[in-house]
């Protein structure tokens, strides 16, 4: 438990524990009544609710909210009052972020260099856990679950939230093993199943036709654009719900960039996509929604059409028009 807990938080915490205890009793009684019926679907729902309330009841940290009760399930992520510091609080990188990211949409993050875009996108799958001196406050919810709660283990989060980096990151393995390795590391051992997922993932990344005859050759023999599509194939192999893309085309030529952008349009049918881009033209081409970051804050969030044609914030307009950068 944190050392400093204000009395109001502690009082609310104890009140909630009492409510959760009563809710568990009520659900257990309802479960007993349902056991004599054939309503298996309702029993499954009741068991899930009991499990959830037991987690809430056992929570020993009053400052950690495991679930968000009023979560809007049109969103894949909801971020509440999120702050992040680097270098033992020497640098305040993200400031009071409140944001909802919609499901099955492409959301572009734009803003000047150093404004917090990449810091933010890496927060969504806990990549900052690997960085010394990082501290944070506030909450990030993924489908109502706090990503820092034990209700959502880190490995599960990483499998549901895939990441594609600025530069292609093929392993020093064959094209096939680049994808198979990720599957094996997540416990998939059956070769027939692995073969199937490798093929499906390469098809999903529009790469299968390019590599089907050279699957066991080194991935480093692929072009930059092909390597980036391989990175995407590796990310979607685990069947995530979200793809995070941190400037995925900045190291590619215009032809390869165009292929990735076309692929993004296809991928959004199955995945929610968050993309960091410095290209205003790219943001307009690929995204449904746009978020403008400035000096660690979200200054504006709206549909891409609204942000680029009728921005509400003067700084958003100045950035889009090239007056600040």
From Swiss-Prot:
Q: Which InterPro entries match?
A: AAA+_ATPase, ABC_transporter-like_ATP-bd, ABC_transporter-like_CS, P-loop_NTPase, PstB-like
Q: Which SUPFAM superfamilies match?
A: P-loop containing nucleoside triphosphate hydrolases (SSF52540)
Q: Which UniProt keywords apply?
A: ATP-binding, Cell membrane, Membrane, Nucleotide-binding, Phosphate transport, Translocase, Transport
What's an example GO cellular component term for this entry?
Answer: plasma membrane
SUBUNIT field: The complex is composed of two ATP-binding proteins (PstB), two transmembrane proteins (PstC and PstA) and a solute-binding protein (PstS).
Q: Which family does it belong to?
A: Belongs to the ABC transporter superfamily. Phosphate importer (TC 3.A.1.7) family.
**What is this enzyme's EC?**
7.3.2.1
Where is it predominantly found? membrane
Q: Where is the signal peptide?
A: none
Q: What is this protein called?
A: Phosphate import ATP-binding protein PstB
Instruction: List the membrane topology term(s).
Output: Peripheral membrane protein
Pfam families to which the protein is assigned, alphabetical: ABC_tran
Which residues are in the ABC transporter domain?
A: 79-320
Which GO MF terms are attached to this record?
ATP binding; ATP hydrolysis activity; ATPase-coupled phosphate ion transmembrane transporter activity
Entry keyword annotation includes Cell wall biogenesis/degradation: no
Q: What is the lineage of its organism?
A: Bacteria, Bacillati, Mycoplasmatota, Mycoplasmoidales, Mycoplasmoidaceae
In the record, biological process GO terms are:
phosphate ion transmembrane transport
What is the purpose of this protein? Answer: Part of the ABC transporter complex PstSACB involved in phosphate import. Responsible for energy coupling to the transport system.
**Ligand binding (ATP):** 111-118
Note the superkingdom of the native organism.
Answer: Bacteria
Query: Which reaction(s) are listed as its catalytic activity?
Result: phosphate(out) + ATP + H2O = ADP + 2 phosphate(in) + H(+)
UniProt entry tagged with the keyword RNA-binding? no
Classification via SMART domains: AAA
Its annotated compartments are: Cell membrane
Tell me the name of the encoding gene: pstB
The species this protein belongs to is Mycoplasmoides gallisepticum (strain R(low / passage 15 / clone 2)) (Mycoplasma gallisepticum)
């Amino acid at each position: 438990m944190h050392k400093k807990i204000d009395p109001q938080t502690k009082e609310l915490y104890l009140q909630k524990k009492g409510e959760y205890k009563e809710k568990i009793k009520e659900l257990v009684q309802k479960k007993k009544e349902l056991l004599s019926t054939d309503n298996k679907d309702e029993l499954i729902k009741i068991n899930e609710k009991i499990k959830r309330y037991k987690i809430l009841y056992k929570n020993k940290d009053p400052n950690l909210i495991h679930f968000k009760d009023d979560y809007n399930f049109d969103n894949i992520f909801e971020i509440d009052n999120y702050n992040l510091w680097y270098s033992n609080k020497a640098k305040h990188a993200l400031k009071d972020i409140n944001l909802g990211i919609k499901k099955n949409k492409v959301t572009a993050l734009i803003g000047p260099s150093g404004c917090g875009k990449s810091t933010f996108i890496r927060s969504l799958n806990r990549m900052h856990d690997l960085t010394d001196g990082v501290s944070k406050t506030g909450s990030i919810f993924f489908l109502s679950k706090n990503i820092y709660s034990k209700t959502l283990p880190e490995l599960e989060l990483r499998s549901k939230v895939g990441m594609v980096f600025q530069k292609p990151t093929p392993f020093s393995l064959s094209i096939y093993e680049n994808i198979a390795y990720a599957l094996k590391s997540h416990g998939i051992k059956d070769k027939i199943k692995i073969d199937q997922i490798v093929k499906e993932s390469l098809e999903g990344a529009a790469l299968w036709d390019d590599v089907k005859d050279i699957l066991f050759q080194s991935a480093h023999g692929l072009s930059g654009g092909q390597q980036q599509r391989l990175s995407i194939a590796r990310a979607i192999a685990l069947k995530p719900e979200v793809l995070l893309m941190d400037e995925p085309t900045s190291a590619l030529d215009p032809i390869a960039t165009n292929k990735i952008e076309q692929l993004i349009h296809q991928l959004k049918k199955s995945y929610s996509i968050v993309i960091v881009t410095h290209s205003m033209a790219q943001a307009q081409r690929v995204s449904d929604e746009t978020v403008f970051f400035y000096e660690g804050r979200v200054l504006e969030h709206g549909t891409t059409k609204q942000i680029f044609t009728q921005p509400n914030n003067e700084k958003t307009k100045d950035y889009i028009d090239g007056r600040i950068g």
